[in-house]
């Protein structure tokens, strides 16, 4: 008689996904855009069965430097604590309008194993060709 060991199937772990959104002013007309962005990302992440929503991080600031944005800093701390796998952001300009910050943080997140997806530009930082394109688009975002 041959005894065969049957291993239970373990489903793959869900990707821990966060979103980052930002409006550049505190004016009332921006409130609707801000709330719409948050709702959109909650629904988008929940629509992927292999994704788990961690949080939608958000800032209502026009600060160009990420060190002045508490939502961004909270997201960075979560990444450093190994609580995130993917960050989704509408565009490079929402992530950072400062070219140096954009490139440094994109590389830093990647060293932590966190992929950033910039929706409008269709860029993923886990793509090895993204650095060149990201540097050009970050420069454009800085001049906007």
Where in the sequence are the language-model features?
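Short, structured surface patches at the beginning of a domain
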Residues: 1-144
């Amino acid at each position: 008689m041959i005894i065969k060991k049957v291993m239970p199937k373990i489903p793959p772990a869900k990707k821990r996904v966060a979103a980052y959104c930002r409006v550049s002013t505190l004016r009332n007309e921006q409130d609707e855009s801000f709330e719409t962005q948050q709702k959109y990302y909650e629904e988008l992440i929940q629509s992927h069965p292999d994704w788990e929503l961690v949080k939608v991080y958000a800032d209502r600031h026009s600060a160009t430097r990420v060190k002045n944005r508490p939502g961004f800093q909270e997201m960075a701390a979560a990444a450093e604590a190994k609580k995130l796998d993917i960050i989704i952001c509408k565009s490079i300009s929402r992530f950072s309008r400062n070219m140096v910050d954009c490139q440094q943080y994109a590389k830093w997140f990647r060293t932590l194993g966190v992929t950033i997806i910039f929706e409008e530009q269709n860029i993923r930082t886990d793509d090895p060709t993204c650095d060149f394109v990201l540097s050009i688009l970050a420069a454009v975002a800085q001049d906007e």
